[in-house]
Amino acid sequence: MCSSDLQIQEFKANLIRPTNYVDVLTLNLFDEFCSFLDQKKFLRHPSMLKYLMEKEQSAPSKVKSTQDTLARNAHSPEFVQFIHQRIIDHITIKDQYRRPYVFMYGIGSMYPYLRVNEFLALYEDYNETDKYKIIVFYPGHRDQNSFRLFDTLPDNHTYRATLLINE
């Protein structure tokens, strides 16, 4: 685990204390994407992820085709549904904990296949804001109502999100 993973897990652990009774779902979007691809069959191959990795190794000239396939799958309704099902499975657990938050991170690892604004736009039809809130840990900084990925790449999209930590 890298330091940001540890920080997010520590933050989650602090919320589950008996005085809070909050159980947060933490989703590394990149890891979830890899799981999605690994479970997805492709032609006669049981795992699209393994197929794409083998293809990239054996045919470096086909890297563009592999990247296009990754981007197409990252934007697919099936991937969005996969994430939604993970969230629904978590928030519907019946026990003493409240589950009002989903921590989403690993967004930077998805670049250039998927950007945070693209994912949030794709997920908007699924989002049930009365049941849970998605909190995105973003590798960059806010510039007015837009963000700069890795403090380098301008996003040029306006967000309705609220900044939780004052700069």
Regions found by a protein language model. Give the residues of each.
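Conserved P-loop NTPase "ATPase switch" module shared by AAA+ and STAND
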Residues: 96-113
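Short, small-residue-biased leader/transition segments that mark boundaries at the very start
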Residues: 2-3
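Short His-Asn-centered micro-motif
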Residues: 27, 104-107, 137-140
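An interfacial alpha-helical scaffold signature
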Residues: 7-32, 132-133, 141-156
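Glycine-rich, aromatic-bearing surface loops/beta-hairpins
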Residues: 113-167
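A short, acidic, amphipathic alpha-helical segment used as a generic capping/interface helix at domain edges
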Residues: 78-95, 123-124
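Long, charge-dense
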Residues: 25-78
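Short helix-terminating capping/connector loops at secondary-structure junctions
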Residues: 20-21, 95-98, 129-130
